[in-house]
Design a protein with these regions (language model features):
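A short, conserved structural fragment
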Residues: 46-58
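Intrinsically disordered, low-complexity basic tails/linkers immediately adjacent to helix-turn-helix/homeobox/MYB/SANT
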Residues: 56-86
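Short amphipathic alpha-helical interaction segments
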Residues: 32-47
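Exposed, interaction-prone assembly regions rather than primary DNA-binding/catalytic cores
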Residues: 76-163
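N-terminal, charged low-complexity regulatory/assembly segments
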Residues: 164-175
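Short alpha-helical segments that sit at the start of domains
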Residues: 1-17
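Recognition helix of helix-turn-helix/homeodomain-like DNA-binding domains
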Residues: 30-33, 55
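Short acidic, hydrophobic short linear motifs in intrinsically disordered regions
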Residues: 19-31
Length: 175
Protein backbone atom coordinates (compact mmCIF):
# COMPACT_ATOMS: atom_id res chain seq x y z
CA UNK A 1 0.00 0.00 0.00
CA UNK A 2 1.37 3.36 -1.01
CA UNK A 3 -0.21 6.54 0.26
CA UNK A 4 -0.90 9.01 -2.55
CA UNK A 5 -0.82 12.78 -2.36
CA UNK A 6 -4.54 12.99 -3.12
CA UNK A 7 -5.14 10.96 0.06
CA UNK A 8 -3.88 13.94 2.07
CA UNK A 9 -6.50 16.07 0.29
CA UNK A 10 -9.20 13.55 1.27
CA UNK A 11 -7.87 13.50 4.84
CA UNK A 12 -7.91 17.30 5.00
CA UNK A 13 -11.55 17.26 3.89
CA UNK A 14 -12.35 14.70 6.62
CA UNK A 15 -10.80 17.09 9.16
CA UNK A 16 -12.90 19.96 7.80
CA UNK A 17 -16.09 17.87 7.84
CA UNK A 18 -15.50 16.90 11.46
CA UNK A 19 -18.40 14.81 12.70
CA UNK A 20 -20.83 15.83 9.96
CA UNK A 21 -22.31 13.18 7.70
CA UNK A 22 -20.83 12.82 4.25
CA UNK A 23 -20.97 10.55 1.24
CA UNK A 24 -18.31 9.48 -1.24
CA UNK A 25 -20.24 11.13 -4.06
CA UNK A 26 -20.63 14.44 -2.28
CA UNK A 27 -16.99 14.48 -1.16
CA UNK A 28 -15.87 13.62 -4.68
CA UNK A 29 -17.86 16.55 -6.05
CA UNK A 30 -16.42 19.03 -3.55
CA UNK A 31 -12.85 17.79 -4.14
CA UNK A 32 -13.20 17.58 -7.94
CA UNK A 33 -12.29 13.90 -7.85
CA UNK A 34 -14.14 10.74 -8.84
CA UNK A 35 -16.02 8.78 -6.14
CA UNK A 36 -13.74 5.81 -6.80
CA UNK A 37 -10.64 7.98 -6.15
CA UNK A 38 -12.13 9.17 -2.86
CA UNK A 39 -13.11 5.62 -1.87
CA UNK A 40 -9.63 4.25 -2.68
CA UNK A 41 -8.07 7.15 -0.78
CA UNK A 42 -10.18 6.46 2.31
CA UNK A 43 -9.17 2.79 2.19
CA UNK A 44 -5.48 3.77 2.07
CA UNK A 45 -5.95 6.27 4.91
CA UNK A 46 -7.56 3.59 7.09
CA UNK A 47 -4.80 1.11 6.28
CA UNK A 48 -2.18 3.77 7.11
CA UNK A 49 -4.05 4.42 10.40
CA UNK A 50 -4.55 8.09 9.51
CA UNK A 51 -8.32 7.56 9.59
CA UNK A 52 -10.54 5.05 11.32
CA UNK A 53 -13.84 3.39 10.50
CA UNK A 54 -15.92 3.05 13.64
CA UNK A 55 -19.56 2.07 13.32
CA UNK A 56 -19.54 2.95 9.59
CA UNK A 57 -18.28 6.44 10.39
CA UNK A 58 -14.90 7.39 8.95
CA UNK A 59 -13.00 10.04 10.87
CA UNK A 60 -9.39 11.24 11.00
CA UNK A 61 -7.12 9.67 13.60
CA UNK A 62 -5.99 12.99 15.08
CA UNK A 63 -2.93 11.70 16.98
CA UNK A 64 -1.53 9.82 14.02
CA UNK A 65 -2.35 12.70 11.70
CA UNK A 66 -0.43 15.15 13.88
CA UNK A 67 2.58 12.84 13.88
CA UNK A 68 2.37 12.30 10.12
CA UNK A 69 2.11 16.02 9.39
CA UNK A 70 5.19 16.81 11.43
CA UNK A 71 7.39 13.79 10.77
CA UNK A 72 6.24 12.30 7.46
CA UNK A 73 4.57 14.79 5.16
CA UNK A 74 7.56 17.11 4.58
CA UNK A 75 9.65 14.16 3.41
CA UNK A 76 7.06 12.21 1.43
CA UNK A 77 5.21 14.92 -0.51
CA UNK A 78 7.90 17.48 -1.24
CA UNK A 79 6.53 20.29 -3.43
CA UNK A 80 7.96 21.19 -6.81
CA UNK A 81 8.78 24.88 -7.06
CA UNK A 82 8.63 26.19 -10.57
CA UNK A 83 8.18 29.12 -12.87
CA UNK A 84 6.47 32.42 -12.24
CA UNK A 85 2.73 32.04 -12.78
CA UNK A 86 -0.70 33.24 -11.68
CA UNK A 87 -2.45 31.30 -8.99
CA UNK A 88 -3.80 31.03 -5.46
CA UNK A 89 -1.43 31.92 -2.61
CA UNK A 90 -0.41 29.02 -0.39
CA UNK A 91 2.03 28.17 2.40
CA UNK A 92 3.23 31.31 4.22
CA UNK A 93 1.37 33.47 1.66
CA UNK A 94 -1.96 31.69 2.32
CA UNK A 95 -4.85 33.16 4.29
CA UNK A 96 -3.72 32.02 7.77
CA UNK A 97 0.01 32.76 7.80
CA UNK A 98 0.25 35.80 5.49
CA UNK A 99 -0.39 38.32 8.30
CA UNK A 100 2.70 36.98 10.11
CA UNK A 101 5.17 36.91 7.23
CA UNK A 102 6.30 39.80 5.07
CA UNK A 103 6.62 39.03 1.39
CA UNK A 104 9.99 40.73 1.01
CA UNK A 105 11.59 40.42 -2.41
CA UNK A 106 10.51 36.81 -2.95
CA UNK A 107 7.39 36.14 -4.97
CA UNK A 108 4.76 34.27 -2.94
CA UNK A 109 4.20 30.56 -3.49
CA UNK A 110 1.04 29.93 -5.50
CA UNK A 111 -0.87 26.94 -6.79
CA UNK A 112 -0.94 27.40 -10.57
CA UNK A 113 -4.50 28.35 -11.46
CA UNK A 114 -5.83 30.15 -14.54
CA UNK A 115 -8.38 31.91 -12.31
CA UNK A 116 -5.73 32.95 -9.79
CA UNK A 117 -5.28 36.62 -9.01
CA UNK A 118 -1.77 36.56 -7.55
CA UNK A 119 1.50 36.39 -9.46
CA UNK A 120 4.00 34.14 -7.73
CA UNK A 121 6.26 31.13 -7.86
CA UNK A 122 4.57 27.89 -8.81
CA UNK A 123 4.15 25.54 -5.80
CA UNK A 124 2.82 22.11 -6.75
CA UNK A 125 -0.48 21.32 -5.00
CA UNK A 126 -1.05 17.92 -3.42
CA UNK A 127 -3.48 17.11 -6.22
CA UNK A 128 -4.46 18.83 -9.46
CA UNK A 129 -7.93 19.81 -8.19
CA UNK A 130 -6.71 21.54 -5.01
CA UNK A 131 -7.22 25.12 -6.31
CA UNK A 132 -10.82 24.38 -7.39
CA UNK A 133 -11.68 22.59 -4.14
CA UNK A 134 -10.03 25.31 -2.03
CA UNK A 135 -11.87 28.07 -3.87
CA UNK A 136 -15.19 26.47 -2.84
CA UNK A 137 -14.31 25.77 0.82
CA UNK A 138 -12.51 28.45 2.80
CA UNK A 139 -11.73 26.16 5.76
CA UNK A 140 -10.24 23.58 3.41
CA UNK A 141 -8.19 26.33 1.72
CA UNK A 142 -6.81 27.43 5.08
CA UNK A 143 -5.93 23.87 6.08
CA UNK A 144 -4.29 23.01 2.75
CA UNK A 145 -2.20 26.19 2.77
CA UNK A 146 -1.02 25.32 6.30
CA UNK A 147 -0.18 21.80 5.12
CA UNK A 148 1.83 23.38 2.30
CA UNK A 149 3.77 25.47 4.80
CA UNK A 150 4.78 22.20 6.46
CA UNK A 151 5.59 20.60 3.09
CA UNK A 152 7.78 23.38 1.79
CA UNK A 153 8.21 26.19 4.29
CA UNK A 154 11.14 27.37 6.37
CA UNK A 155 11.47 26.27 10.00
CA UNK A 156 9.46 29.17 11.48
CA UNK A 157 6.71 28.79 8.87
CA UNK A 158 6.49 25.04 9.48
CA UNK A 159 6.35 25.53 13.24
CA UNK A 160 3.63 28.15 13.04
CA UNK A 161 1.61 26.09 10.53
CA UNK A 162 1.86 22.99 12.70
CA UNK A 163 0.60 24.97 15.72
CA UNK A 164 -2.33 26.34 13.72
CA UNK A 165 -3.25 22.88 12.43
CA UNK A 166 -3.16 21.45 15.96
CA UNK A 167 -5.52 24.20 17.12
CA UNK A 168 -7.91 23.53 14.26
CA UNK A 169 -7.88 19.76 14.71
CA UNK A 170 -8.54 20.23 18.41
CA UNK A 171 -11.75 22.02 17.49
CA UNK A 172 -12.91 19.03 15.42
CA UNK A 173 -11.29 16.19 17.39
CA UNK A 174 -14.35 15.47 19.51
CA UNK A 175 -16.95 16.10 16.82
Amino acid sequence: MILKSQDVLVLAKLVVIGGDEWSYGRMATTLWMSPSEVHAGVKRLIKARLASDQQNRITPNVRNLESFLLHGLPYVFVPDLGEITRGMPTSYAGPVLSPFFQAGEDLPPVWPDPDGEVRGQSFSPLYKSVPKAAREDEWLYELLSLIDAIRGGRARERQMAYGEIKKRMGLNAGS
